[in-house]
Amino acid sequence: MDVYQISCDLRPGVRDAEFVTALNAYLGSLKKTGRIETWRLLRRKLGLGIPALGEFQILIETRDLAQLDEAFKAVSTRNEPVEGAHHGVNSLVTNFQAALYRDFPDPHRQLGEERF
């Protein structure tokens, strides 16, 4: 699995429940149409964490980069209904950062022949 990780904070005045509702609508639609496998929302607890990483973490899982690319293509059309759902989330957040991770070790990896 590949994991697209998003870190963000809420814009001033945005309620956390409003953010959750918008995120459910947006990522729920991507999951329902098979563009992502699953997603999770995490929130910093007890104020612990690296401030630069934001209060919220969104973990979006895809089977592989091909599925993630299809999700990006769907969103980048800027057509409804995905555009409205994407804007519904994007307009609520600030300090957006993203990263891409994979399960490790890779399931196809062979051990013993590495040269480094």
Identify what each model region corresponds to:
Residues 10-13, 63-64:
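Structural beta->alpha junctions
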Residues 1-2, 49-52:
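Short, flexible turn/loop "capping" segments at secondary-structure junctions
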Residues 42-48:
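Short, solvent-exposed loop/turn elements at beta->coil junctions and helix N-caps
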Residues 6, 19, 23, 58, ...:
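Hydrophobic pocket/interface hotspot
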Residues 109-115:
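Short, charged, intrinsically disordered terminal tails
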Residues 14-41:
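Short amphipathic alpha-helical segments
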Residues 29-37, 51-55, 59-104, 115:
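An amphipathic, aromatic/His-enriched active-site/gating alpha helix that lines ligand/cofactor pockets
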Residues 2-9:
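Active-site-flanking beta-strand signature of metal-NTP-handling nucleotidyl enzymes
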